[in-house]
Amino acid sequence: MAKYFGTNGIRGTLEDVGPAFALQAAQAIGAHFKCGRMLVARDHRLTGELLRNAVVAGLQSAGCEVIDLGITTSPTAEFMLGKMKADGLIIITASHNPPEYNGLKVVDGKGISVSKERGEEIEKLFGNVKLADFGSIKPVQGHGTSAREHMDAMKALLHPDRIAKRKPFIILDLGNGTTATIAPQLLKELGCKILTINSHMDGHFPGRPSEPLEQNIQELIRMVKETKADCGIAWDGDGDRIVFVDEKGNFVVGDKVCALSVLLKLKEKNGDVVTTVATSKAVEDVASKFGCKTIYTRVGAPYMSDVMANGKAVIGGEEVGGVIWPELSLAKDGIFTAAKIVEAICEKPLSAWLKEIPAYYNVKTRVECSEKRKKAVLDGVWDHATSKGGRVIRHGDDAIRIDQVDSWVIIRASGTEPCIRIFGEAKSKDKAEALVKEYEKLARSLA
Ligand code: MG
């Protein structure tokens, strides 16, 4: 079992992911990528600069050529990885976690982020890396035009004329995150009228918690209603996750953003759709309407991008509002998802688009649980579920999904936080709530 790598890289507070640790980890990562050409990017967290310095020192001392992209969104960094054909990328980010967290997200040259399993291989190199000779240390190169290059690539995939003609009014809640480096500029250039809130990057996240949950974006919801905006958009801290508020002020959950993205993509081009076992069945229903296949993976971006790299998928997405557009990268790109949906609402309102998505009720909750107790909770859930009958499947070592007619529930040990996540879905709200309550109670008693 990997000690430090979770479902999406390494995360922790400065105590666990400090400069000495980051230096050692970066040396091991550099060696894993054969000491080649490595990109480094970071978000704007308070510990970002010190970890960046340690990561760069680690890579350089392992003999890598380092290109520093500076502060960018994760999707921008992952787009640049493909564009610059580098051997690997380290993004210093803790995504949507609280301010005191930071982490290392590691992506290989194919654009696939390093999973727990592959992380275990890297961990074996910790402390065992042969340092480069004095004469072969390479200077660090800066690269300051990533946002511009990412924007140009996105614009080439859109129809800016349609947006410029309609001039939609959009409110952006940047959550004091890195989307400030790109999202307002892109939407302005596309011809939108925009209003931004929480728009300065601030590692204290003074405006709202970084995770774009409904309870965290109440200000955006209120402003969309008051100003009669065409929609509101909110991202997490590093810009891979996105949620919407429709023109009536309704929160649009990540599953629906994902299903709508699939609908928009398949209208243009048919192909396989990749999603995780924790995503709403609405995605599969949309794909079936177009006669397209849905491929399910374990929860975690690495598993989705792995399938996408080796198959014929035209789009991928997961329930938190992360959508992969393979023409740009194999990473979740919340910036392009924003632009794509903004383009669609120039044709008809967001609420009208959402009527085309099959209605399911989703209930999501979490139960606090230490790392030590996660296995015991999952074992208990397994015993309970299998004794009741129905289709019960384990997905990897961290999730159990129980399928009944027209409803399902997944119980999953979080790979990034000390908690168990429980998501349920059904055709009726009562049924979804009852299903989630049953497993929430059980998990609580076992945690
Ligand atoms: Mg994120």
Task: Provide a role label for each language-model segment.
Residues 1-63, 68, 87, 137-170:
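An N-terminal, well-structured beta->alpha segment
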Residues 86-101, 224-246, 251, 294-333:
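Glycine-rich phosphate-binding loop
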Residues 120-156, 247-319, 324:
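Proline/glycine-rich low-complexity loops and linkers
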Residues 13, 102-227:
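Gly/Ser/Thr-enriched, mixed-charge loops and adjacent short helices
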Residues 269-447:
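Phosphate-binding and adjacent anionic-ligand microenvironments
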Residues 31, 38-102, 185-245:
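N-terminal small/polar loop signature for handling phosphorylated ligands or for N-terminal nucleophile
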Residues 41-43, 172-174, 246, 327, ...:
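Short glycine-centered, acidic/aromatic-flanked micro-motifs in structured strand/loop junctions
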